[in-house]
A protein has these predicted regions:
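Plant-biased recognition of short, low-complexity, intrinsically disordered N-terminal tails
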Residues: 1-3
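Alpha-helical death-domain superfamily interaction modules
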Residues: 6-10, 21-171
Length: 171
């Protein structure tokens, strides 16, 4: 298996939404300010290699990222890993490299509809100024902004819980 070639092929198949998701899930390893210049998957892979989170001999973080964003096609085709293998692997204590907190936020963002996103922005106006909540901002961007303002974190879920409860109890 040609490591660089596989990374290139994977990167070519990831769209901007996939990239935004991968960047969000990598925030615990690559801080936001270091992510700003990342414009494509290859740049992200390069940063992950610099952090030793992605190596030819250790693809577990990349596999977990692709699994979390539900790109099972890439997992199977390029990394020869099935969904069941990943589920088993991530059940083992200490194996998951992406925090449960980050995964939870990502899952919420995947479940929120457009109208619920508008409600989210409306309900957060007091905490985040309107100009920061522009129209093209997605929920992952909002979570990042909330983290910057220290109103969201692993131990700070009150505002998120309140807003989710107001919008949709199933969140």
């Amino acid at each position: 298996m040609d490591f660089s070639r596989n990374l290139y092929d994977i990167g070519e198949q990831l769209d901007s939404e996939d990239l935004a998701s991968l960047k969000f899930l990598s925030l615990d390893y690559i801080p936001q300010r270091k992510q700003e210049p990342i414009k494509d998957a290859l740049m992200l892979f390069q940063r992950l290699q610099e952090k030793r989170m992605l190596e030819e001999s250790n693809l577990s973080f990349l596999k977990e990222l692709l699994f979390r964003i539900n790109r099972l096609d890439l997992l199977i085709t390029y990394l020869n890993t099935r969904k069941e293998e990943m589920e088993r692997e991530l059940q083992t204590p200490g194996r998951a490299q992406i925090s449960a907190y980050r995964v939870m936020l990502y899952q919420i963002s995947e479940e929120v509809s457009r109208s619920e996103l508008r409600s989210f922005k409306f309900l957060l106006q007091e905490e985040i100024s309107k100009c920061k909540l522009d129209d093209d901002m997605n929920l992952l961007d909002i979570f990042i902004e909330m983290e910057k303002r220290v109103i969201l974190g692993e131990g700070k879920l009150d505002i998120l819980k309140r807003v989710c409860a107001q919008i949709n109890k199933s969140l």
